[in-house]
Amino acid sequence: MHLAVSLNITSGQPLGFSDLAGFAKQAEAAGLDMIVLDDSAPNSAGSSSFEATTLLAALATVTSRIGLVAAASTVAHQPYNLARRLASLDIISHGRAGWHATMAQAPREAANFSRPDGFSDDVFRRRTQEYIGIVQRLWQGWDADALLFDKIGGRFHDPEKMHLLDHKGEFFSVRGPLNVARSPQDTPVLVLSGLSEADLDIAARTADVVLLDRPTEDAKARHDDLKRRVVACGRDPGAVKLLLNVGADVAANALETLFSSQSCDGFNIAIPPAAIDGFIGRVLPELQRRVRPDYPGTALRSHLGLAGGAQ
């Protein structure tokens, strides 16, 4: 059973770094796969919080195993800058980084980035699909051994192992490559959520992890449908993990029952900042008794059973 915790750090009273560091350490001690941090507040103009990737870089220095996933919008960032920032986080964390890209629009966010009226659903979907493809290919712009740093021979890199993106699409033009080395786990983990029916094929082609809404009677059918789409895209069904979103008050027994019905690969537990203490004191000990005793490796991909580089 794979377990993630997600925390919107803009909800409620702002959290200090010491609070967040303590939470990350407790989650790691319990063996959870990853923390997903969201720093956006679509309905509140008065929110204040750290920027997610910057915060996760700091949390990487006080943890050593748990995955560190930043929510980052395709509206609020240019693909080159975001790819570079997440690749840097992956290097800093020794292969534990991930990107949570939501397929849902946030009107307030769009208004802050020169799109006061947002995008139509179709345009947003096409733009997001192009954006994700650019980021993933930028991450693959250098082979693992492409950078030589050969001072004597005067060679910075092996040209045969550098791959220019040279992308010219409907919405973006990006030449590449990144000025950051290849990620320790090949590419950071891509997490998608906010999926409509039309978005599921995008997820099947590109995602490593899919977050779906709270468990329902058709959870098993949704799980099987996604896995069929993954196979239809030429991928192994295990290449995409489906986690169901649940609340912080969920009972561990209920998770175990739902997981045994083969309706998902695990769960993403959404925690309001005000509920952190209760979650650490009541829920984490129960989860710790039910998950693996230790991490199988050091990289997020190894925790999730996904193919990649350093494990």
Located regions from the model:
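N-terminal small/glycine-rich loop or linker at the start of catalytic domains
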Residues: M1-L15, P107-N112, K161-L195, A239-D249, ...
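N-terminal beta1-alpha1-beta2 module of alpha/beta enzyme domains
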Residues: M1-T63, T187-P188, T298-A299, A307-Q311
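Hydrophobic faces of well-ordered beta-strands that scaffold small-molecule active sites
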Residues: L3-L7, I35-L37, I66-A72, G95-A101, ...
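Flexible, glycine-rich active-site loops centered on histidine and acidic residues
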Residues: S6-L15, Q78-K161, E217-D218, P272
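Catalytic domains of carbohydrate-active enzymes, especially glycoside hydrolases
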Residues: S18-S40, L200-D213, T257-G266
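Glycine-rich, proline-tolerant flexible connector loops at the mouths of alpha/beta enzymes
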Residues: M34-A52, D213-K220, N268-G281
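C-terminal helical cap(s) of enzyme catalytic domains, especially alpha/beta-barrels
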Residues: F113-S120, Y131-Q136, A219-K227, P273-P296
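Long hydrophobic segments that form regular secondary structure
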Residues: F171, L178-A232, D236
